[in-house]
């Protein structure tokens, strides 16, 4: 499209960062994620001109600047630096559960990082500087654990460019978190139920792996998987495909596992699901609530047994 057709509105998306916080819809309700089209709408005359006047020149210039930066591909040296730091952030994300999703998103832009990618990297760095220490709490138990508990969640079509969904979750044993993950689904789900089913499949696979590891160590643990997706839980508990034949058969092995009693599926409220932090950007309140449910806490200072690799003690 070269010109704007119809009245244009500015809407606020749920979550996201600066340049992805806004999207445009025409009078027909069609969603347009293209920055080029959005700028065309702002610069055109006619119905969009009234919108531009109502929005204000300052806001328009701010949006134009953000849109330009989003398309500003980094130079070779800057791109190499971006990849190196993002790779270290991804390595750190294995321990820092609060940065798992952000690190994953940074690594997705390795092929062609732009100014927007760099801003997200800086934002993650500022967050780690403000919250340098995340402590895993392993409570003392008089009796050994009897169950592996998995929390999983999916953000349907969370990526505005590819429309792919993000699945994430955590594994708990004895009230302590032992594993977490956040990954983009390899295929584009046709519905939220299908995306959530794939997410439940990932959670079940992680739980079965931990259950098998415990069995090798002589612990016979039950497996309990929690999700806030009613439709996906219904599909996983039923027998056969019915009217959902378009789903991949590779995702329906969960039905057999449920029938055999190898695992149990439970419904959990979305507000109580700690896996929400692994599928999208969340605010501080949701993040801290999810971390507390996983027995993770922020602390000040530096751990006594932490290696002094940068000579910080000598500087003091």
Mark where each language-model region is.
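Short hydrophobic beta-strand that contains or immediately precedes a catalytic carboxylate
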Residues: 24, 149-152, 225
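RNase H-like nuclease module associated with reverse transcription
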Residues: 109, 145-147, 186-316
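C-terminal reverse transcriptase regions that engage the nucleic-acid substrate
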Residues: 55-133, 269, 277-279
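Short coil/turn segments at secondary-structure boundaries
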Residues: 19-21, 28, 35-39, 44-45, ...
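Structured nucleic-acid-interacting core domains from mobile-element enzymes and related host factors
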Residues: 126-154, 218-219
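Signature of WW domains and closely related Tyr/Trp-rich beta-sheet microdomains
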Residues: 1-56, 60-61
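RNase H-like nuclease fold core
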Residues: 89, 147-193
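Acidic carboxylate-rich catalytic motifs and surrounding loops in phosphoryl-/glycosyl-chemistry enzymes
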Residues: 104, 138-140, 179-182, 261-273
């Amino acid at each position: 499209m070269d010109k704007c057709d119809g009245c244009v509105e500015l809407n606020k998306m749920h979550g996201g960062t600066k340049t992805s916080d806004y999207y445009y819809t025409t009078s027909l309700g069609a969603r347009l994620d293209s920055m080029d089209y959005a700028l065309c709408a702002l610069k055109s005359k006619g119905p969009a001109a009234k919108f531009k006047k109502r929005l204000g020149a300052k806001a328009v210039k701010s949006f134009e600047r953000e849109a330009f930066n989003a398309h500003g591909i980094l130079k070779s040296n800057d791109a190499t630096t971006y990849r190196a730091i993002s790779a270290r952030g991804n390595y750190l994300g294995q321990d820092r559960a609060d940065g798992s999703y952000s690190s994953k998103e940074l690594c997705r832009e390795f092929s062609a990082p732009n100014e927007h990618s760099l801003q997200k990297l800086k934002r993650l760095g500022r967050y780690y500087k403000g919250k340098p220490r995340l402590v895993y709490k392993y409570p003392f138990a008089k009796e050994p654990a009897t169950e592996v508990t998995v929390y999983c969640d999916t953000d349907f079509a969370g990526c505005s460019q590819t429309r792919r969904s993000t699945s994430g979750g955590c594994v708990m044993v004895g009230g302590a978190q032992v594993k977490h993950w956040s990954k983009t689904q390899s295929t584009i789900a046709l519905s939220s139920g299908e995306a959530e089913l794939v997410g439940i499949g990932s959670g079940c696979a992680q739980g079965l792996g931990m259950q098998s590891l415990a069995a090798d160590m002589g612990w016979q643990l039950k497996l309990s998987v929690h999700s806030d997706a009613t439709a996906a839980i219904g599909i996983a508990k039923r027998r056969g495909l019915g009217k959902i034949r378009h789903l991949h058969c590779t995702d329906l092995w969960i039905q057999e596992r449920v029938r055999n009693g190898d695992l149990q599926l439970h419904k959990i409220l979305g507000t109580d699901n700690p896996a929400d932090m692994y599928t999208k950007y969340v605010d501080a309140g949701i993040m801290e609530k999810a971390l507390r449910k996983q027995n993770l806490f922020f602390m000040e200072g530096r751990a006594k047994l932490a290696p002094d690799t940068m000579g910080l003690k000598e500087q003091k």
